[in-house]
UniProtKB/Swiss-Prot annotation:
GO terms for biological process: viral RNA genome replication; viral translational frameshifting. InterPro entries: PA/PA-X, PA/PA-X_sf. Belongs to the influenza viruses PA-X family. The keyword Coiled coil does not apply. GO terms for molecular function: RNA binding. The record marks R195, K198, R199 as: Important for efficient shutoff activity and nuclear localization. The gene is PA. Pfam families: Flu_PA. It is found in: Host cytoplasm; Host nucleus. The active site is at E80, D108. The record marks K202, K203, K206 as: Important for efficient shutoff activity. This is Protein PA-X. The probable endonuclease active site in the N-terminus and the basic amino acid cluster in the C-terminus are important for the shutoff activity. The C-terminus acts as a nuclear localization signal. The C-terminus is recruited to host protein complexes involved in nuclear Pol II RNA processing. The keyword Lyase does not apply. It comes from Influenza A virus (strain A/Hong Kong/156/1997 H5N1 genotype Gs/Gd).
């Protein structure tokens, strides 16, 4: 699974996922299913926000290429992927500026068009079950919830799907591609079933023997985001970097 993650996700996403796991004391080399899940969630959050801007009249528009007008601003502020301290700083700043209530839990995005925080979910189970779990945890009508599945289903608060159909279809296509690529490598069943994942982990550790824990070869590409997070969220060039990996995975 670790090899799959490094082959199929943009290096910037992989680096952010590793950083997130290490912040919580988790090892991407051991908890590989969680590693894959975090990368998937990060990519969906980026895809959700990409190409969406607000013009000088406050209208939401889509810009897919070129250098947009300087008056345009990103419609979504990405909170997911930041370290906790910085993420809460961003949330507090948004609350102070807009007057919205501070959420109890860190959300994934802030929608400047609808003036609300958004929680993005990606589930391997039924969307309505995961939606209810999210809603029961958040317990706030202020935070909008949008759930995607690997089977093309989705569910959102009050059936408000926020994005246009094409943008949502792009996300669903990417999730379906990830599922197909996992299945072709025999990884999907263990990704879906925790019990199967534990069995696979024991098998992997046994096969690795005394080499377990040694560093593996990683991409030498270093994301500027790790040097300074802010430009990544505001720089339009991140779109091109991520876009290349959306609809394809390199085969072994």
């Amino acid at each position: 699974m670790e090899d799959f993650v490094r082959q199929c996700f943009n290096p910037m996403i992989v680096e952010l996922a590793e950083k997130t796991m290490k912040e919580y004391g988790e090892d991407p080399k051991i908890e590989t299913n969680k590693f894959a899940a975090i990368c998937t969630h990060l990519e969906v959050c980026f895809m959700y926000s990409d190409f969406h801007f607000i013009d000088e009249r406050g209208e939401s528009i889509i810009v897919e290429s070129g250098d947009p007008n300087a008056l345009l601003k990103h419609r979504f502020e990405i909170i997911e992927g930041r370290d906790r301290a910085m993420a809460w700083t961003v949330v507090n700043s948004i609350c102070n500026t807009t007057g919205v209530d501070k959420p109890k839990f860190l959300p994934d995005l802030y929608d400047y068009k609808e003036n609300r925080f958004t929680e993005i979910g990606v589930t391997r189970r039924e969307v309505h079950i995961y939606y209810l779990e999210k809603a029961n945890k958040i317990k706030s009508e202020e935070t909008h919830i949008h759930i995607f599945s690997f089977t093309g289903e989705e569910m959102a608060t009050k059936a408000d799907y926020t994005l246009d159909e094409e943008s949502r279809a792009r996300i669903k296509t990417r999730l379906f591609t990830i599922r197909q690529e996992m299945a072709s490598r025999g990884l999907w069943d263990s990704f879906v079933s925790p019990r199967e994942a534990k069995r696979q982990l024991k098998k992997d550790l046994k096969s690795q023997g005394p080499c377990v824990g040694l560093p593996t070869k990683v991409s030498h590409l270093t994301s500027p985001a790790l040097k300074t997070l802010e430009p990544m969220w505001m720089d339009l060039n991140r779109t091109a970097a991520l876009r290349a990996s959306f609809l394809k995975c390199r085969k072994k």
